[in-house]
């Protein structure tokens, strides 16, 4: 069988794989239908490679497979919506920091940074690239600004700083920080505080984090904000 924690990992991996497939697609191709079709093919590939046919041999396994597929389709819809509502576009997925990775020049303050960020988006404005980092989550963890000020829960912000510092070495372009976010990709819509299932779905589809207060960045993040 597949545990719920394994299902979360599956949805996370499917969302990342979908992102790699749509790199370079024109905006007109980012319809819900087109992105869902790409996700369906991604789910089929991952299901065969990671889970296998044994999952479908009993009722619970078939239920779990349906749930994972539904969660993946919702993640695909949300991803497409994030791109359509603004001007940021994916620059890469599972971007690595440290020796032998995409951003090897990741030493900050004498400390060598090593790790990965799930997704990097870029908004190109003249000769400057505005960057945002996005961490895919299957739980309900949210960035904690107070915690960041106190020196904990700073992982996303450290990656963003290192990304902007290393960007000119990799791309030859100047970079500025635009934001750091969690993207909740789970399928868990318990009615929270009476808001209702649909309200929770809409809320879960948002990028949850902090955005630079530059009007250009706000407009590029969501055209309805400014």
Q: Where do the language-model regions lie?
A:
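Structural signature of nuclease core domains in nucleic-acid processing machines
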Residues: 1-226
């Amino acid at each position: 069988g597949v545990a719920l924690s394994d299902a979360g990992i599956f949805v996370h991996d499917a969302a990342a794989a979908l992102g790699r497939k749509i790199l370079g697609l024109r905006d007109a191709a980012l319809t819900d239908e087109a992105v869902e079709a790409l996700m369906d093919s991604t789910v089929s590939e991952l299901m065969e490679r990671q889970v296998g046919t044994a999952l479908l041999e009993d009722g619970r396994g078939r239920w779990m497979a349906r749930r994972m597929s539904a969660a993946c389709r919702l993640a695909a819809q949300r991803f497409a919506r994030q791109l359509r509502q603004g001007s940021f576009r994916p620059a890469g997925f599972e971007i690595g920091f440290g020796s032998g990775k995409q951003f090897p020049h990741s030493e900050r303050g004498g400390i060598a940074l090593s790790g990965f960020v799930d997704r990097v988006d870029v908004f190109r404005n003249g000769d400057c690239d505005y960057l945002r980092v996005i961490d895919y989550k299957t739980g309900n963890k949210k960035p904690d600004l107070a915690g960041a000020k106190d020196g904990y829960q700073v992982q996303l912000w450290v990656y963003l700083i290192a990304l902007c510092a290393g960007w000119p070495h990799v791309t030859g372009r100047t970079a500025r920080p635009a934001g750091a976010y969690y993207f909740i990709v789970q399928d868990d819509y318990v009615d929270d505080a009476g808001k209702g299932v649909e309200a929770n779905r809409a809320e879960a589809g948002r990028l949850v984090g902090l955005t630079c207060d530059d009007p250009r960045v706000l407009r590029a993040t969501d055209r309805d904000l400014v």
